[in-house]
């Protein structure tokens, strides 16, 4: 059985979003959400959740290269907890080290410097977070 999964790449100004299916293990970028000091428009997040009806939501966990936590790590955990508390969705965290760099590299290769828009990078990062979550077998399939 395939499950639908939404992924978020949390940031204080922009939150990337992607959707995927466990049967294919691939993700598709969705429009990023603007945030102000890490606070998104919760109504837009709610609409996204209602539109896609995910079985699970994955939030990228920004860790330092040595695996230690940083300020943004705590904010991402808080965002994940709020998703669960507000909407009752199952939320899992996924290590997101190097996803932003990898997303920038992919976008640059496709469209050059002009294609490197922050929201696009964040949503491609969300795709990479979700695909790595699928690769790790986290969906239990």
Swiss-Prot record:
Give the CDD domains listed for this entry. YqgF
Q: What is the lineage of its organism?
A: Bacteria, Pseudomonadati, Pseudomonadota, Gammaproteobacteria, Pasteurellales
Q: Which NCBIfam families match?
A: RNAse_H_YqgF
Q: What is this protein called?
A: Putative pre-16S rRNA nuclease
- Keywords of the record: Cytoplasm, Hydrolase, Nuclease, Ribosome biogenesis
In terms of InterPro entries, this protein maps to:
RNaseH-like_sf, YqgF, YqgF/RNaseH-like_dom, YqgF/RNaseH-like_dom_sf
Name the job this protein performs: Could be a nuclease involved in processing of the 5'-end of pre-16S rRNA.
Which terms under GO biological process does the entry name?
Answer: rRNA 5'-end processing
């Amino acid at each position: 059985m395939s499950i639908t999964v939404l992924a978020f790449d949390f940031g204080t100004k922009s939150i990337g979003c992607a959707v995927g299916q466990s049967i294919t293990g691939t993700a598709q970028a969705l429009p990023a959400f603007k945030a102000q000091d890490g606070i998104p428009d919760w109504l837009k997040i709610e609409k996204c959740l209602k539109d896609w009806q995910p079985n699970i939501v994955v939030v990228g966990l920004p860790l330092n290269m040595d695996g230690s936590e940083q300020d943004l790590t705590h904010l991402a955990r808080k965002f994940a907890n709020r998703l669960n508390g507000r909407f009752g969705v199952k939320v899992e965290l996924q290590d997101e080290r190097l996803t932003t760099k990898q997303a920038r590299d992919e976008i640059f290769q496709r469209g050059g410097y002009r294609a490197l828009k922050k929201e696009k990078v964040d949503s491609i990062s969300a795709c990479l977070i979700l695909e790595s979550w699928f690769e790790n077998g986290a969906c239990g399939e």
